[in-house]
Amino acid sequence: MTERIRARGPRSSSVNSVPLILDIEDFKGDFSFDALFGNLVNDLLPSFLDEEADSGDGHGNIAGVDGLTNGHLRGQSAPLSSAPFFPEVDGLLSLFKDACKELVDLRKQVDGRLNTLKKEVSTQDSKHRKTLTEIEKGVDGLFESFARLDGRISSVGQTAAKIGDHLQSADAQRETASQTIDLIKYLMEFNGSPGDLMELSALFSDDSRVAEAASIAQKLRSFAEEDIGRQGASTAAGNATPGRGLEVAVANLQDYCNELENRLLSRFDAASQRRDLSTMSECAKILSQFNRGTSAMQHYVATRPMFIDVEVMNSDIRLVLGDHGSQPSPSNVARGLSALFKEITDTVRKEAATITAVFPTPNEVMAILVQRVLEQRVTGILDKILAKPSLMSPPPVQEGGLLLYLRMLAVAYERTQELAKDLRAVGCGDLDVEDLTESLFSSHKDEYPEHERASLKQLYQAKMEELRAESQQVSESSGTIGRSKGASISSSLQQISVTFVTEFVRWNEEAITRCTLFSSQPATLAANVKAIFTCLLDQVSVYITEGLERARDSLSEAAALRERFVLGTSVSRRVAAAAASAAEAAAAAGESSFKSFMVAVQRCGSSVAIVQQYFANSISRLLLPVDGAHAASCEEMSTALSKAEAAAYKGLQQCIETVMAEVDRLLSSEQKSTDYRSPDDGIASDHRPTNACIRVVAYLSRVLESAFTALEGLNKQAFLTELGNRLEKLLLTHWQKFTFNPSGGLRLKRDLNEYVGFVKSFGAPSVDEKFELLGIIANVFIVAPDSLPTLFEGSPSIRKDAQRFIQLREDYKSAKLATKLSSLWPSLS
């Protein structure tokens, strides 16, 4: 477009010398207004630019530019030239007017062409629509023609299909008729003379056509048996005439089938000896027509070496039980069974490969094989290792007892279960191998709970007999090692042993493990677990109760020993000395029996804690799935342990009696009348406790050390509270035997401080309060007679005890204290 505009508009300085001619073609393609405008004005503007450049080169800066600032001249006073500043403007205006005129003309031309094109397009569109309408009518007609053609084709096809069905039915009938004729001919041959199989067709004697002969024989036999059945039914209804049937054919066919089956089995055995799998498969396929091949499958399984070889059976026994005459252990039996069952699994896996290649229904054969393995080979070895013992006369513990049988049963059951899983993985058809395995142990599992309880009872009895034997042996040898040392050893053997209780729990835990193994149903498991745990409760209850009773017997013997040496007042000095020596021995026996009983109580608590922990960790989770089972076991546990609690309570009462008896003896023997009524009253008093107090506190500290260790919680608090109350009463009774002067009162206060300091270790507030009141009452021996009335103004509850103590004052009569106090405390007079 640029070239065309330049060609039509030659450059000229004259305004009217530019003939502009614009063409429509100039606006086609990539039109640019800037290019059009440039081509229009480039012929005029360059002359002006050239002149401006020439003027600048000749005179330097243009005066009009350099000197003009804000519309005024600067540096010159001469006026500007009168020549026009932009002379081409008139040419440009003329050029633009001509261009606009030509553009208007071009627009009119374009509008005319567009109107013409619209008319042409409208005409062509009408023709096109008319053509499309005609084409649609033609297509509709074509579709109708196709529909008629499709209907005719469908009709012809249905007719052809009917004809084909008729032809196929006719061919099948022809084939059936042909086969029926052949079958009738064969049936007549078999219906000849009874037992005569010599005149049969060659088909029945040709070894190459055995499969065909077997198929035909089965068809003939089925038909003949059905015919005989129909004749029997008609005769029973009275509608048939007697005549000859197909009895001979049935008998001959049975003989032929038996002979053919035996012949095939012989061929199958011969091929099996050669490991000719193709011949075996052919024979098995033919034999499958006889009783679905059951005889062939059973025959194959029965002829396996592991079922008929006696050496295999003997090898199994040696592998599991070891050498003849040796006592097998459960661990050795477990290893032997694992090895044996692995061998059985490998053998079955090899047989499975052969069975899959030979038999048309391998799953049925595998079911027969696995069943035979479990019922013959596995049962044979289980019968050898699981001889059920009698509960009336069980085997002795020295020979393993009932526990050996139970352990063997658990090992055999676990290994057989593993074998069942392995055989299931190898393949056993539709056989429920797990149920069959369970049936092998059904007789043992039915009586298992009774055997388990009897075993626990046998173990407990054996342990107790062992303990009694050791104690008896120590007693018999006590003369050799010394009487006291032997008695000490015997007593330690008779003490409660936490180790024994732990062993009882271990027995029970092992029994629970077996119970979980044998009991699959939650209800059965809960019932068996409860029964077995009850055995443990009975054992622990009896054991710790008997241990506590033995410890109580020692306390009773010590008490009897004390009573034996209680003497009257009028005895000789020699007898009194002997009695005192014997009393010291009785006190030592009492202290020893006290400590022994505390040890028994401590071990009893530890044993109960072990049982309770075992119940929480192992038993409760097995009982929770069954409603009421957990609560019932908790109640049984409480009932069983209540006997031990009763024995412990009685023994603790005896311990308190023992301690009080010795405290009374020490006070009676060590307390002197001068301790609280010294003749040198007024001299500096002795601030030390009395010897009796020192001995009593030392004894209590020594003997109660074991109580502090053995008892805990509420039991400890109750025991020490009772002991403190008894001690307070005993001291009150004891001090009422003496007369007190002021220095003796101070000595009594010193004793009381010792007692108060000791009983504070009990941690019993009620006891502390009683001893504090004793300290207040003891002040009656120290204050002056006139101060007695005001001594108990804040504690009126102890006035009665205080009055009894006041009567023990040395100056009670001389100071006429009875009269003074009766006037002040009339309620006490």
Curated annotation (Swiss-Prot):
Assigned keywords, A-Z: Coiled coil, Cytoplasm, Exocytosis, Secreted, Transport
UniProt cross-references to Pfam families, sorted A to Z: Sec10_HB, Sec10_N
Domain of life: Eukaryota
Effect of disrupting the coding gene: No visible phenotype, due to the redundancy with SEC10a.
Location within or outside the cell: Cytoplasm, Cytosol; Secreted, Extracellular exosome
Family: Belongs to the SEC10 family.
Quaternary assembly: The exocyst complex is composed of SEC3, SEC5, SEC6, SEC8, SEC10, EXO70A1 and EXO84B. Interacts with EXO84B. Binds to EXO70E2.
Protein name: Exocyst complex component SEC10b
